[in-house]
Design a protein with these regions (language model features):
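Bacterial Sec-dependent N-terminal signal peptides
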Residues: 1-23
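Non-catalytic cap/lid and distal C-terminal segments of serine-dependent acyl enzymes
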Residues: 21-39, 43-81, 88-391
Length: 391
């Protein structure tokens, strides 16, 4: 190879290396590492900057602000109560360094003079059913189990359907596994978010499609369809939300969601071929829709949810002498920080009632995470998904 060819090859290698490291070009496991020293497009600073030692630097240019603080899921694993203040420099740039943090994804906001907002310099932000927040991705030495690895990938299709229940157009996302065969009947997991989530949050925050791809590649789960369902069927701040949402959601499943999925995909169209699961409010939908609809579902995943008065709200299910015969799998999970706090009162109330009536279930508590996406991703990968359809 002559000198010109060698120089060209080296230049090409450098160019390709730089190209591969650009944020938002590839589905990188370390998109906030700042490998090129470039400021994100339309931003004025690099924030957050995630270092290989798992420390994180946040920056905000706000010369007229009187206070800036960090609020987010990382404070739970740090054992910090309340927000973490920034320090203001003479140049008007506020800075905060935290960590090292465990490898994970964290949601956060900045609190500027008492006003909570997404980080204006962070290109990773959530699209959700509540005011937006920013994403912090603390990387390890390579792709994690929630990342897009070099494995066969399934597909996610967004469908729009008309609901006679809500009398409008609604969306549903359906994951099909790698090597999906439209002639083969698959079991279906119907997966829901919480009070502030949209179906797409299970992909972008929950990474459920990548988690499922990786579990299948590792031989740890059964191939299945996953329907990401919009369980926002009445405004969350409606004064009768708690009284109406469960009945409306049951109708939505019976009259719209399940008929749509069964008519567009080849499914195992019986209770043993269906699972229902959700986080927080979606976990309560799982309880108060799913456990009251044993003609539809036989598998249940209750994530970060429960009830203080299950004898009244779930009396028919609890007193059914054939409940264990009708239920293939009942999973209950929460984060370690949740188990020590407010949310555990409902979870414990639900578990105590199940124990009293001899109803079988599996309980799974993960790490020191709180009421956030870190908990729900971990519960899917380590707990719920590997156990589905194994009975």
């Amino acid at each position: 190879m002559n000198k010109r060819s060698t120089t060209a090859a080296i230049s090409l290698l450098i160019a390709l290396t730089a190209f591969a490291q650009q944020s938002n070009v590839n589905l990188s496991y370390n998109p906030q590492k700042d490998t090129e020293g470039l400021i994100p497009f339309s931003a004025n600073l690099n924030s957050p900057q995630v270092n290989d030692d798992h420390t994180v630097v946040f920056r905000l240019r706000a010369p007229k602000a009187e206070s800036v603080a960090l609020s987010g899921a990382m404070t739970t694993v740090m054992g910090v109560r309340g927000n973490i203040p920034f320090t203001k420099g003479e140049d008007g740039i506020w800075t905060l360094t935290i960590g090292p943090l465990p490898v994970d994804m964290y949601q956060y906001n900045l609190v500027v003079d008492g006003v909570s907002m997404a980080d204006p310099n962070n290109t990773y932000a959530a699209f959700t059913a509540m005011p937006p927040y920013s994403e912090l991705i603390v990387h390890g030495d390579g792709p994690s189990w929630w990342d897009a690895k070099d494995v066969p990938h399934g597909a996610v299709t967004r469908h729009i359907y008309y609901s006679p229940v809500t009398q409008g157009q609604r969306e549903i996302y359906v994951y099909t596994p790698p090597q999906y065969d439209p002639k083969k009947a698959y079991p279906v997991l119907y997966l829901m978010g919480g009070s502030g989530e949209l179906p797409s949050n299970w992909m972008y925050d929950g990474r459920v499609n990548f988690i499922m791809d990786n579990l299948l590649a590792e031989g740890k789960a059964e191939p299945m369809l996953i329907a990401l369902v919009n369980n926002q069927v009445i405004h969350r701040n409606h004064p009768q939300h708690a009284d109406l949402t469960f009945d409306i959601m049951e109708r939505e499943y019976r009259e719209a969601v399940i008929p749509f999925v069964d008519s567009h995909y080849k499914t195992i169209a019986n209770p043993h071929g269906r699972a229902i699961s959700g986080l927080s409010m979606g976990g309560r939908h799982t309880m108060f829709v799913g456990l009251k609809s044993l003609d539809l579902f036989a598998n249940f995943g209750v994530l970060s949810a429960g009830d203080n008065t299950p004898e009244q709200t779930l009396g028919e299910f609890l007193n059914d002498p054939k409940a264990n015969d009708k239920v293939d799998y009942l999973f209950i999970g929460q984060g370690g920080a949740e188990e020590k706090g407010f949310f555990n009162m409902r979870v414990k109330g639900f578990r105590d009632a199940l124990d009293k009536h001899g109803i079988e279930y599996e309980y799974f508590c993960i790490g020191e995470t709180g009421h956030d996406w870190s908990t729900w991703r971990h519960l899917l990968y380590y707990g719920f998904l590997p156990k589905l359809w194994k009975k």
